Amino acid sequence: MAAKLTKKRKTLAEKVQRDKAYPLSEAIKLIKECAKAKFNESIDVAINLGIDSRKSDQAIRGATVLPHGSGRTVKVAVFAQGDNVEKAKAAGADIVGLDDLAERIQGGDIDFDVVIATPETMRVVGKLGQVLGPRGLMPNPKVGTVTTDVASAVKNAKQGQVRYRTDKNGIIHCTIGKVNFEEKALEENFLALLNDIKKAKPSAAKGTYLKKLTLSSTMGPGIAIDRTTVGA
């Protein structure tokens, strides 16, 4: 059975020409055709940027609210006090607290995907850097997770906001949806992310900024995107 599945996946993968860059709409269609796993695979993008990742002024970090969401159920924790506690809860936060939430995190209970904090609570949150930082959960104003408007931050997280940052090779990896999304929805999610990354271009970056764009599903082959079809 396993051999049969492998052969089928190989046949599907052969549809993709390795040396060809596809128009975005065609690439998305191919990815959906090649995604034959028994679970709802994620659609991921890798964007190679023409930056010097060794220089801090060229590192890129940000967040995009995908118009059609990411397909993930996101659990949100909020550090807040006063009126912001009720605002966070009303917006849909799963966990809201301050010192009690910090103790919970220090004890290893980290059952959430996004952490949001108001500026005045950072005196408490700042002490959790060694726990939250390595997990990519440390609140940061650059991605809107340190904010006075906790309600909007919670709603954005719940509605499909994705966070991104360049890795040591100057590549951004991000999920833009699931295989069961409509092709048009995936296309619009991709373009929303790409437009935000374009706006974040460092002034010090030289030459071609968007060097290579690749889409793939969790178990499928990578498909290069023709940059000219997305205004890159």
UniProtKB/Swiss-Prot annotation:
Similarity comment: Belongs to the universal ribosomal protein uL1 family.
Quaternary structure and partners: Part of the 50S ribosomal subunit.
Domain of life the protein comes from: Bacteria
Gene this protein is translated from: rplA
Coiled coil feature spans: none
Record lineage: Bacteria, Pseudomonadati, Pseudomonadota, Gammaproteobacteria, Legionellales
GO molecular function: rRNA binding; structural constituent of ribosome; tRNA binding
Keyword RNA-binding: yes
InterPro entries with a match to the protein in the record: Ribosom_uL1_bac-type, Ribosomal_uL1, Ribosomal_uL1-like, Ribosomal_uL1/biogenesis, Ribosomal_uL1_3-a/b-sand, Ribosomal_uL1_CS
GO cellular component: cytosolic large ribosomal subunit
Disulfide bonds: none
Keyword annotations from UniProtKB, A to Z: Repressor, Ribonucleoprotein, Ribosomal protein, RNA-binding, rRNA-binding, Translation regulation, tRNA-binding
Protein name: Large ribosomal subunit protein uL1
GO biological process: one example: regulation of translation
Function in brief: Binds directly to 23S rRNA. The L1 stalk is quite mobile in the ribosome, and is involved in E site tRNA release. Protein L1 is also a translational repressor protein, it controls the translation of the L11 operon by binding to its mRNA.
